[in-house]
């Protein structure tokens, strides 16, 4: 069984990298981490922006230069309806394998992309990540689910899956809670 441990970890990480879903959902969700921020400048005439390697889910995209503004996310099919030809100041964006804008920028715009990261996979050179460091029970439950499936012990696998779903949702909720005290 121990010879398959790396496989169980790899399989667990496929779950951990998914978007979170409530514990009572029929789907199996992942764990959302603390919001990360990436800054840069949009390139004039280029209507796309590469996603960070650890991107899981968008939180906000803002222009941070002289005129601070938040761009509005729209579904991919809606971006086609909002598409403008030529160049200008983008107002809308969507996400595919890149961030796509409704219009190519007419200038260089400073931006801040706020997003939820996915967990970095464990390896010989990367022995920890934010989930393992903060929520080791989530890793354990996901790995044991796959181990018991491998052993064809469906009852134990179901128990560990239920625990994983509860723990992963709880871990994700930790990052959704307000960070500001409302006083006593």
Put a short name on every predicted segment:
Residues 1-184:
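Glycine-enriched, solvent-exposed interface loops adjoining structured elements
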């Amino acid at each position: 069984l121990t010879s398959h441990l790396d496989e169980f970890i790899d399989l667990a990480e496929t779950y951990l990298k998914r978007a979170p879903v409530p514990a009572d959902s029929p789907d199996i969700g992942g764990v959302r981490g603390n919001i990360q921020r990436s800054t840069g400048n949009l390139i004039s005439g280029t209507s796309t922006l590469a996603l960070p390697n650890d991107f899981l889910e968008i939180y906000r995209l803002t222009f941070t230069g002289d005129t601070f503004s938040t761009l509005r996310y729209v579904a991919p099919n809606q971006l086609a309806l909002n598409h403008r030809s030529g160049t200008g100041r983008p107002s809308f964006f969507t996400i595919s394998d890149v961030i796509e804008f409704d219009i190519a920028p007419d200038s260089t715009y400073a931006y801040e992309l706020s997003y939820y990261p996915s967990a970095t996979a464990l390896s010989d050179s990367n022995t920890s990540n934010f989930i393992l460091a903060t929520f080791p029970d989530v890793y354990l439950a996901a790995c044991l689910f796959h181990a018991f499936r491998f052993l064809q012990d469906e009852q134990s696998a179901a128990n560990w899956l239920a625990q994983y779903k509860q723990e992963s949702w709880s871990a994700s909720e930790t990052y959704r809670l307000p960070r500001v005290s409302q006083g006593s």
